[in-house]
């Protein structure tokens, strides 16, 4: 299978077929061959043009840069090892290779593993094992293990009377002491399902809400409480919940149990994924019109479409409490803005091109504003990132927009006059201290 193409491209990762049983138990069909063709004909992770020229859901899902957003903001320890269970077609594997010292990716489908091999062909720190994790014998333990869209299928791939718990127990044995498991999964009671979206895995509306009446399907998701209980009963002492928005598959914002969306947050069509494209006939409500009430009534955690759970015996969890990702931008502008527990804000470039161009230009813009006499948030460089202290103040943009909504044009003129006077040195620099003035790149990230 693709032996000639592999030989021609001579990828760097190790491709281990020792545990492969010569059958692929799942597939998206012929489109997977087309995806492999796109991967082979383009430089790694440069698929945007090809995706939009031949747009369909499987191609977009497997090759979209938004797939990386589930983990590209996460702080992995330096020199760490990671086991990726269910790497699929490599959507997240390259992120792990860039962030960790050693990566072992396991994939049950040889065709999908081949896609990962070619997609990560330049990664020398990667081994891909084709086979069922339950059959594989490992000779080492890992700092991190990822289960991104995998746990829900263990009713099919783990033979046990309690497959979900037994699978997690096995995984815990592969972690180093204080190692961390990262689990991404849909919420059984996600808001999209209440609106009539067919359940992601079985394709039937309200199937999860109705408690998965057909238990023979071998696939299911969990509520937050049920998932937390399952993880802890499997032996993990601590959990920390993140809420990828709009879901874990194509997230643009990562909320957490410490930083939940507030009334003023932009939970609307700006970052909204159109779930209705699958089958509009099943929808009974418009999801994006419900979020304001969900947030105001304090039940976002129950209705969040997806979870990302950090699991460990260590209590050192939740180092990052919020992240906003801009992977949908052009490559040179892709950034992760993340809030840390120690009240700093880090802007991390997600591509080398962004690090080399946009970050440098950002600092130039900051200096220009300073030289012009405009008081702005202080930024510093740290390991390739742009770092600042978190300041709990409104953005000037928001203050002006609120005045506009209220019809208070006098307030708008007053603020503009203050900026002009500060620019000309005609008023004290602390006159605008109650407002944050940010560069254009910053203003949307820290709302």
Labelled PLM ranges:
Residues 316-397, 407-432:
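Conserved ATP-binding subdomain of kinase catalytic cores across diverse folds
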Residues 182-205:
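Conserved class I S-adenosyl-L-methionine
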Residues 89-100:
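Conserved SAM-binding loop of SAM-dependent methyltransferases across substrates and taxa
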Residues 217-241:
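Short alpha-helix
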Residues 137-145:
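A short acidic, Gly/Pro-enriched loop at the edge of an enzyme's catalytic core
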Residues 1-41:
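N-terminal auxiliary segments of SAM/dcSAM-dependent transferases
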Residues 162-180:
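A short glycine-rich, Lys/Arg-flanked "PGG" loop and its adjoining helix->strand segment in the class I
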Residues 99-127, 132:
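Class I SAM-dependent methyltransferase SAM/SAH-binding core
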């Amino acid at each position: 299978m693709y032996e000639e193409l592999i030989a021609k491209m001579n990828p760097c990762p190790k491709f281990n077929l020792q545990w492969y049983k010569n059958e692929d138990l799942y597939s998206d069909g012929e489109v997977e061959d087309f995806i492999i063709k796109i991967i082979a004909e383009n430089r790694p992770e440069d698929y945007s043009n090809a995706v939009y020229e031949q747009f369909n859901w499987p191609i977009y899902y497997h090759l979209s840069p938004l797939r990386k957003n589930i983990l590209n903001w996460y702080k992995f320890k330096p020199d760490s090892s990671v086991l990726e269970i269910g790497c699929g077609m490599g959507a997240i594997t390259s992120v792990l290779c860039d962030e960790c010292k050693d990566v072992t990716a396991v994939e049950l489908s040889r065709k999908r593993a081949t896609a990962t091999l070619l997609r990560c062909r330049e990664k020398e720190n990667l081994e891909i094992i084709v086979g069922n994790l339950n059959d594989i014998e490992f000779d080492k333990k890992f700092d991190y293990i990822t289960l991104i869209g995998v746990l829900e299928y263990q009713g099919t791939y783990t033979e046990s009377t309690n497959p979900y718990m037994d699978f997690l127990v096995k995984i815990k044995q592969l972690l180093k002491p204080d190692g961390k498991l990262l689990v991404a999964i849909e919420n059984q009671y996600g808001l999209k399902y209440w609106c009539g979206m067919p359940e992601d895995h079985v394709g039937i509306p309200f199937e999860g809400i109705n408690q998965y009446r057909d238990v023979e399907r071998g696939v299911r998701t969990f509520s937050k409480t049920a998932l937390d209980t399952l993880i802890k009963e499997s032996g993990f002492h601590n959990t920390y919940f993140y809420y990828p928005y709009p879901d874990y598959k194509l997230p643009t914002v990562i909320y957490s149990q410490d930083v939940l969306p507030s009334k003023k947050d932009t939970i609307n069509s700006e970052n909204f994924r159109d779930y209705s494209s699958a089958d509009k006939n099943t929808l009974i409500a418009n999801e994006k019109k419900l979020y304001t009430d969900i947030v105001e009534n304090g039940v976002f955690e129950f209705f969040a479409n997806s979870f990302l759970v950090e699991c460990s015996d260590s209590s050192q969890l939740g180092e990052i409490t919020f992240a906003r990702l801009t992977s949908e931008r052009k490559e040179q502008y892709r950034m992760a803005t993340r809030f840390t527990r120690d009240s700093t804000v880090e802007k991390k470039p997600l591509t080398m091109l962004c690090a080399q161009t946009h970050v440098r230009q950002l600092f130039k813009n900051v200096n220009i504003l300073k030289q012009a006499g405009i008081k702005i948030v202080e930024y510093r460089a740290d390991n390739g990132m742009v770092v600042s202290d978190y300041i709990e103040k409104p953005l000037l943009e928001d203050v002006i927009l609120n005045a506009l909504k209220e019809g208070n044009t006098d307030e708008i003129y007053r603020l503009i006059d203050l900026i002009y006077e500060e620019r000309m040195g005609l008023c004290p620099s602390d006159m605008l201290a109650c407002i944050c003035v940010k560069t254009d790149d910053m203003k949307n990230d820290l709302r």
